[in-house]
Amino acid sequence: MNKFFSILVPHYNEPVEVIKPLLDSIAIQQNIDMNEIEVVICDDGPDAILLPDEFLKSYPYDIQYHREPKANVSVMRNKAFDYSTGEYVTWADADDMYYTCLALWFVKKETQTPMQVPINGVPTTVNGFDALYSVFLEEGRNPQTGETYFIDRKDGFQFIHGKFFRREFLVRNGIRFGDDLSIHEDNVLNLQVQACTQNIKWCPVPFYLWKWRDNSVCRRDPLYLKKTYPDLIKSSNYSLEWLTNKSKFDKAREVVASITLDAYYTFCHPSWKTIETQEYRDGAERYFAEYFKKWEYLWNECPDQVKMQISSGIRQREVIQGMEMETETLEQFLNRIKNLS
């Protein structure tokens, strides 16, 4: 029997006590028939922690549980999607949860609510959505006091958290995670979605909680973004291959402009100029040089107005985060980068 909702969960080293809050938060959803819900869990390899059968069968909705060959989080997300039967799908991390008992009721209501979207430049009323993006909550810890805090993630387009998709839309457009991407992989799927539809609803009220976990590398290592910046460029390269193969050139030009300007302002930040980060900066610049060599033609084709809009947003972000002044002009940066390739 096909379901209305499929909640797709990659799983590796999360024991029962860690994944239980997620499954519990689904079980307490109100005004939703539990027969309409399935959770699809995919274990990443034979060394993944085995979830007991009696534990999974204790829930009032169906759970598919699959042990897959060792790969990575993107492959597990794709595998779970392939197993799913729901009309609408969403991905959730095994160590997160829904923090409101009305999350699925709200999303289902929005699948039946009309909205206006521009189709060929004409405002058109459509029912439901191809994608629903929402604010989500992030749980954090004060590094000095250990005190818990929560913040609204309103700019979370680089995350998959709190997003629902019409399954048929994803299948029809061949939208998937990149199988060889395991870091900064979420923005790949989000870019594909935005390139294929304007039928995206925005929910300003959060219902997904990105929980704190003590061994989370991405939030505990202060050098995480510097160490993984080449992975961000790799994800962008994958997106550009996908977009150009689909002849989505306007979106591809925006992506190149975004990464190019992000690299420029990021490398101007004082934190990238310390002895501690020199190794990461050198590696990231060499990786970006190869990227820019491949996609420079799209940068050159991107309208100046688009570049200016993107530049303004990124520069404002970096100033807020501590950049005082550009240490070189954009032209100087690009000329220097070209000499690295």
Regions found by a protein language model. Give the residues of each.
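Short, well-formed alpha-helical segments that are part of the catalytic scaffolds
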Residues: 14-30
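A conserved acidic beta->alpha catalytic loop
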Residues: 41-52, 93
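Glycine-rich, basic loop-to-helix element that forms the pyrophosphate-binding segment
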Residues: 68-84
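Donor-binding/catalytic cores of nucleotide-activated saccharide
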Residues: 73, 94-203, 208-227, 247
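Short aromatic/hydrophobic "clamp" motif used to bind/position activated sugar donors
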Residues: 89
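Cell-envelope/extracellular polymer assembly enzymes that use nucleotide-activated donors
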Residues: 3-6, 25, 38, 188
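Membrane-interface aromatic/basic loop that binds lipid-linked glycans or pyrophosphate carriers
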Residues: 65, 115, 272-341
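Short beta-strand/loop segment that forms part of the nucleotide-sugar
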Residues: 35-46, 64-69
